[in-house]
Amino acid sequence: MTKYNWDERHIITFPEKKLALETKDLHVYYGQKEAINGIDMQFEKNKITALIGPSGCGKSTFLRSLNRMNDTIDVAKVTGQILYEGVDVNASNINVYEMRKHIGMVFQRPNPFAKSIYKNITFAHECNGVKDKQTLDEIVETSLKQAGLWEQVKDDLHKSAFTLSGGQQQRLCIARAIAVKPQILLMDEPAASLDPVATMQLEETMFELKEDYSIIIVTHNMQQAARASDYTAFFYLGDLIEYDETKKIFQDAALQSTSDYVSGRFG
């Protein structure tokens, strides 16, 4: 078994680029166990960043901390800063529900509401008092077009979301997330339950979405990370080990551990 120097780091920063998000000394604890060990990380605006690493390395925990999904776990504690447009969204005075309108989440398994396709998109707006049908119609059409689903469902908008295939349901969940106009989309293994065709369609949707959104995706699929992302970050045991342009990570990684992981020789 190869021995690696886990004190080595290679982490890119973006001093001259527009940032979508930045973490400073971010720690996540579950009870007494530290799951994320003080991560400093910057995300460039309108790019796709992939988070990779072995199961249990902390990448999903880190992702969920970025819009405070870990708040729902009683024993979880998050310290450090999560900076969005200069505001620390980890601060105690932040309205979490308002913040999530700016930093949306798409989960591993499609989770459409038990409503029509149309109502899945308009639900949040209607809850906030939007009633004008023309406005809602425009939101539905725009969101479904951006998610690459409009042409497939435009004649079936009032059918149950559960009539859609798995891949279509996942794109509906993306449409639902972007309907409230977030700046950032967090995706936790969004293709894990999809077949190869649906996965490719999802990746094509991501390429189109990055024109308007910054995307951070957790994936176990190295081919997907290589194909679909601009930057890749390698996590191990709660630490950010290497972070660079995806091409460099997969073709000329700075660290042996990263090179071995992406090439399947890790261990």
From Swiss-Prot:
Manganese recorded as keyword: no
Keyword Translocase attached: yes
Membrane-related topology note: Peripheral membrane protein
One cellular-component annotation, GO: plasma membrane
Main localization category: membrane
Pfam families: ABC_tran (PF00005)
Protein EC: 7.3.2.1
Gene3D superfamilies reported in the protein's UniProt record: P-loop containing nucleotide triphosphate hydrolases (3.40.50.300)
An annotated Gene Ontology molecular function: ATP hydrolysis activity
Biological process terms in GO annotation: phosphate ion transmembrane transport
Occurrences of domain ABC transporter (ranges): 21-262
Keywords: ATP-binding, Cell membrane, Membrane, Nucleotide-binding, Phosphate transport, Translocase, Transport
Top-level taxonomic group: Bacteria
Catalytic activity: phosphate(out) + ATP + H2O = ADP + 2 phosphate(in) + H(+)
InterPro entries, per database record: AAA+_ATPase, ABC_transporter-like_ATP-bd, ABC_transporter-like_CS, P-loop_NTPase, PstB-like
CDD domains: ABC_PstB_phosphate_transporter (cd03260)
Protein residues bound to ATP: 53-60
Compartments it resides in: Cell membrane
Similarity field: Belongs to the ABC transporter superfamily. Phosphate importer (TC 3.A.1.7) family.
PANTHER family in UniProt: ABC TRANSPORTER I FAMILY MEMBER 17, PHOSPHATE IMPORT ATP-BINDING PROTEIN PSTB 2
Function of the molecule: Part of the ABC transporter complex PstSACB involved in phosphate import. Responsible for energy coupling to the transport system.
Subunit note: The complex is composed of two ATP-binding proteins (PstB), two transmembrane proteins (PstC and PstA) and a solute-binding protein (PstS).
Protein name: Phosphate import ATP-binding protein PstB 1
Organism, as annotated: Streptococcus thermophilus (strain ATCC BAA-250 / LMG 18311)
